[in-house]
Amino acid sequence: MKFAYNKLYWDKYHEKVSVKINPLKNPSLLLTGSSGAGKSYSLKWLLLNLLVEQKVNLWFCNYKDSCDFKFLKLHEKYYTGEACEEGFQKFYEYFLEMQKKSEDSITQMSILIFDEYPAFILRQQNEDKKKAEKYTRMLADILMFFRSYKGGCWIICQRADSQYFSSSRENFHNRILLTRGRPSKESLQMLGFTKDDLLDTKYNVGEGIAYVDGQGLFQIK
C-alpha cells in the first residue's frame, strides 16, 4: 500500500514517487506530530490506502471525539471518550481469540486505530495506575504478537513519550514524525531518529521523516 511520497524526489524532480509497505508484514504504526502538522489528514489518507488494498476488520478509538473522524460514528466498532476503554479491551480480547487459530485460517487484517492514546493512558495513570499498567501491557502484547495473526495497532499522538508506551515503542513496524520547521532533538529521540536524519531545509505541513521496518529511513511528504 502507499505509505507516503518520497520528499527527496519531489523536491528535486517534482515527481510523486511512492514509499510502499506491505501492511501484512508491517501492520503497526506510530504517527506523531505537533498540532497542525497534518496528522489527521495523513491518517485518513493512510486508512484509505489500506482499505483499497486489504479487507480489514477495523476498530477505531477516537478518545477526544475529534470531528475529523465523525464519518465513522455509525461504524459498530467506533468508540469515543470513556468508551475507548471498552473498545480497547474488546480488541485485546479479539486478539487473544485470534491466537487460538491457525495463522493460515485468518482471512482478513484486524487493525485498531487509537487517536490520542497518550491522553487516554495519562487519565488512567491519574485515576488508577494498575489499570494504566494493564493497558500498557495490552498494547505491548498486540505490537509484539498480533502481526503473526494479521493484526496490529495504529497509534496517533503529538508526543511519543516513553511513559505512555513503556518499552513498546521499538515494536512499531512503521514510525512517522510529521513536523513543521525543524523538530526538536527530544521529539526525534522519541522515535529513534537523530538530527543527522534531517534535511537541511525546513519541513512544511504534512512533511517529515519515517522509518519502515525492513526498508529504513525516508524523507516524506
Ranges and model annotations:
Residues 42, 46:
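Hydrophobic positions on the alpha1 helix immediately C-terminal to the Walker A/P-loop
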Residues 87-99, 131-155, 181:
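Substrate-engagement module of ASCE P-loop NTPases
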